Amino acid sequence: MKIGMILDAPFPTDPRVSNEASALINAGHEVFLFCISFKKDFKRNDILNSIKVKRYYCSKLLYKFSALAYTFPFYKYFMSRKISHFVKENEIEHLHIHDIQIASSVYHANKTNIPTTLDLHENRPEIMKFYKHVNSNLGKILISPQKWKIAEEKYIKLSDNVIVVTKAAKDEISKRINIESKKITVYPNTVKKQFYKNHDLNNSIINRFKSKFVLLYLGNTSKRRGLDMVINSIVTLKNLIPNLMLVVVGSSSYDDSLKSLVIKNKVKDFVSFEGWKNETEFPSYLSIANIGISPLTSNIHHDTTYANKIFQYMSFGCPLICSDVLAQKEIIEEYKVGELFKTENSNDFSKTVLELYKNSEKLKTYSLNCKIAIENHLNNEIVSQQIVSMYAK
């Protein structure tokens, strides 16, 4: 089958897209990828890992209108012409839409009613409520998360298949929209085997932290990720775990606030902000981590999605300490890979860290369970078979 994936972003950037495409190609399908370039000088036709990449120009100014995709129709009309050209030129037989932002453009272009799959990378209507630009004075006037939710429900109903990140997301959509659960396939953003089996290590990173008891945080550091609560807990933990070090690998516009909190709490010697790093550096940090943390705050989005970091932690046998938001709770309890603490509760977080620090046998058990869960159940080569089966129906 000729599958046309639609991504309104440059490529390659998103591992979810490339992982799904690779699985479908290995199953015998032909995958064409519509994507955009912000540069006028670009390679229009490309082949990357057998994915037939077709790039189309989109200025950064016009791309900003994607935030208004369900307020004004400019972006929809502009992108739909390009998508229509892509569909005809490549004789696409099935359209695979990567997230709700571009969905209206695809359906406007789909004049011949080609079968569609809507791939929801996250609960966009809920998470956008926390975006800085949405909460600006102008954003509050122009951008309505409620309109995005209405659009999401509309295109879920119109699509032949829907893909979500977690079982919790599947359950939430099934109840909210009243559609059959068999229409929805779960595909989490987990790791490929090569991530944890074929990698290089940076000795300078390892040497800096090898004598420390490392709490590792990977990923975006925005307020809703809960790092301010963790930093507050360091005030107590540093007196109980002398070689403690919180290592933060990631960044966001909230970093200045986090760094100010570190100074205010006088814990500068116990926190290392590493900044944003390429994924190729992650194995070095994971190899020196004693515990991987995911202290997400509670909201509908976090209840229905997995942070990529939890699978990255697990693949290196790094025990987890996670806030008890629903999706994380399911992973911890099903695979016995770590401990939960009450969301946004620094005392409970501190207590949980200290208990694991004092119990080396439990840490070893969780570490082994992490590796078993990834190798036998949760690596991408296994979970991607759900998408292959969906297309085989």
Where are the model-predicted features located?
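Carbohydrate-associated surface elements
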Residues: 168, 190
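Nucleotide-sugar-dependent
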Residues: 14-15, 225, 274, 280-285, ...
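A short, well-ordered alpha-helix in the C-terminal region of glycosyltransferases
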Residues: 348-351, 355, 362-377, 386-389
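Conserved acidic donor-binding segment of nucleotide-sugar-dependent glycosyltransferases
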Residues: 334-335, 339-346, 355-361
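Conserved donor-binding/catalytic core segment of Leloir-type glycosyltransferases
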Residues: 163, 208-234, 367
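N-terminal subdomain of nucleotide-sugar transferases
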Residues: 1-41, 45-52, 90, 161, ...
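Membrane-proximal helix-turn-helix segments that form the acceptor-binding/catalytic region
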Residues: 77-85, 104, 108, 124-126, ...
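Nucleotide-activated donor-binding/catalytic signature segment of Leloir-type glycosyltransferases, i.e.
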Residues: 249, 256-283
